[in-house]
Amino acid sequence: MNRPSGRAADQLRPIRITRHYTKHAEGSVLVEFGDTKVICTVSAESGVPRFLKGQGQGWLTAEYGMLPRSTGERNQREASRGKQGGRTLEIQRLIGRSLRAALDLSKLGENTLYIDCDVIQADGGTRTASITGATVALIDALAVLKKRGALKGNPLKQMVAAVSVGIYQGVPVLDLDYLEDSAAETDLNVVMTDSGGFIEVQGTAEGAPFRPAELNAMLELAQQGMQELFELQRAALAE
């Protein structure tokens, strides 16, 4: 098995997390998984959705989008089409669920955090890059809210990261790029906490059904890659 990038089966793409990437948001990063690049911002606003009013807890929600020419051919903006596509809705819900798992919302006060993930260049793994980068931006945003005295305590329960794994040419591989993803027999997106818990596992057999042994091999590979991602997040936060 030869990966198009020349990477080993268990090798992540070069990953870079640049903090404080934009001026106005409480937290922001540019996250790069190889040639996939996503700007993740976290904005804090006072108040919560109607269903949470008066309960003394906060909320987190997410939006996701891709620039028209983030891919090989230009895609029409969803705003000009008048509605979001099913893929966009699925991904932004995944991002929201994943980041809420990192927080104790009762310590957020009646504040809402808006996660915005905008893909400026796509080469596979945009949702996993978004979750990994948005976690760092979220931690920076919480530090800003703490300085403002807006928090009841430390809402952060755990770090969260995500990575893709798949079966490519019959072999489990880590962190698929677009060429691999397009030809993979199986594709999984895995979201985990730094304590080793799984938040979400999304898996689809594209070429042939996968067997329990292959699923276990992919999950083990994801866990291995996740440890590297948590180290990269911590290193970025230490800068």
From Swiss-Prot:
<keyword id="KW-0808">Transferase</keyword>
<dbReference type="GO" id="GO:0016075">
    <property type="term" value="P:rRNA catabolic process"/>
</dbReference>
<keyword id="KW-0698">rRNA processing</keyword>
<feature type="binding site">
    <location>
        <begin position="125"/>
        <end position="127"/>
    </location>
    <ligand>
        <name>phosphate</name>
    </ligand>
</feature>
<dbReference type="GO" id="GO:0008033">
    <property type="term" value="P:tRNA processing"/>
</dbReference>
<dbReference type="InterPro" id="IPR050080">
    <property type="entry name" value="RNase_PH"/>
</dbReference>
<dbReference type="GO" id="GO:0000175">
    <property type="term" value="F:3'-5'-RNA exonuclease activity"/>
</dbReference>
<dbReference type="InterPro" id="IPR001247">
    <property type="entry name" value="ExoRNase_PH_dom1"/>
</dbReference>
<dbReference type="Pfam" id="PF03725">
    <property type="entry name" value="RNase_PH_C"/>
</dbReference>
<comment type="subunit">
    <text>Homohexameric ring arranged as a trimer of dimers.</text>
</comment>
<comment type="similarity">
    <text>Belongs to the RNase PH family.</text>
</comment>
<dbReference type="InterPro" id="IPR020568">
    <property type="entry name" value="Ribosomal_Su5_D2-typ_SF"/>
</dbReference>
<keyword id="KW-0694">RNA-binding</keyword>
<protein>
    <recommendedName>
        <fullName>Ribonuclease PH</fullName>
        <ecNumber>2.7.7.56</ecNumber>
    </recommendedName>
</protein>
<comment type="function">
    <text>Phosphorolytic 3'-5' exoribonuclease that plays an important role in tRNA 3'-end maturation. Removes nucleotide residues following the 3'-CCA terminus of tRNAs; can also add nucleotides to the ends of RNA molecules by using nucleoside diphosphates as substrates, but this may not be physiologically important. Probably plays a role in initiation of 16S rRNA degradation (leading to ribosome degradation) during starvation.</text>
</comment>
<feature type="binding site">
    <location>
        <position position="87"/>
    </location>
    <ligand>
        <name>phosphate</name>
    </ligand>
</feature>
<dbReference type="GO" id="GO:0009022">
    <property type="term" value="F:tRNA nucleotidyltransferase activity"/>
</dbReference>
<dbReference type="InterPro" id="IPR002381">
    <property type="entry name" value="RNase_PH_bac-type"/>
</dbReference>
<keyword id="KW-0819">tRNA processing</keyword>
<keyword id="KW-0548">Nucleotidyltransferase</keyword>
<dbReference type="InterPro" id="IPR027408">
    <property type="entry name" value="PNPase/RNase_PH_dom_sf"/>
</dbReference>
<keyword id="KW-0820">tRNA-binding</keyword>
<dbReference type="GO" id="GO:0006364">
    <property type="term" value="P:rRNA processing"/>
</dbReference>
<dbReference type="Pfam" id="PF01138">
    <property type="entry name" value="RNase_PH"/>
</dbReference>
<dbReference type="InterPro" id="IPR018336">
    <property type="entry name" value="RNase_PH_CS"/>
</dbReference>
<dbReference type="InterPro" id="IPR015847">
    <property type="entry name" value="ExoRNase_PH_dom2"/>
</dbReference>
<dbReference type="InterPro" id="IPR036345">
    <property type="entry name" value="ExoRNase_PH_dom2_sf"/>
</dbReference>
<dbReference type="GO" id="GO:0000049">
    <property type="term" value="F:tRNA binding"/>
</dbReference>
